[in-house]
Amino acid sequence: AVTNALKHADRIVSPKYMTAGNGDGGPCHPRDNIALSWFAQEIDLGYDIFGDIMRIREQQAENVAHELCSHGRDIVILGKSFKPETHLTDGSASMLIGHYCEQMHKTVHYDGAPSTKQKYTYLLAHNRDYSNYNFNKDSIIVDLYRKHQDDNNTVIHYGNSNR
């Protein structure tokens, strides 16, 4: 029954959602997972996958923050909203990463660097083309989607075990 149901969920269970990248976000998914986690515990489901999804989201955000902070520079997060093409920041995984960076006493800027001379650690938080973005020279770029190339900066394809 579960397998047959998943066959009809091709809008959600699709390559669009099965790529490396930033954590789940938005005003709906995290809220829904929290409610479903409560319900799973309320009915003693036996395994709370929804709670685990939220714990993993938090842990992954903290892991990315550790990577960003490990370079000792101020941080610029490109992509403050919860997804591209919107200004909504409710449940933004990028802002969660920024929160953890601030807890580690780092200065975080969103969607642009305040200085053109300073070297930053950039986070490419959305799955989009950044090839025309004017990164400050000799900066570090952490790419969650493992696509960006840059000859003037160090690029880290986060999560790539073949680097």
Regions inferred by a protein language model and the residue ranges of each:
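Structural/interface elements that position substrates and couple domains in central-metabolism enzymes
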Residues: 1-163
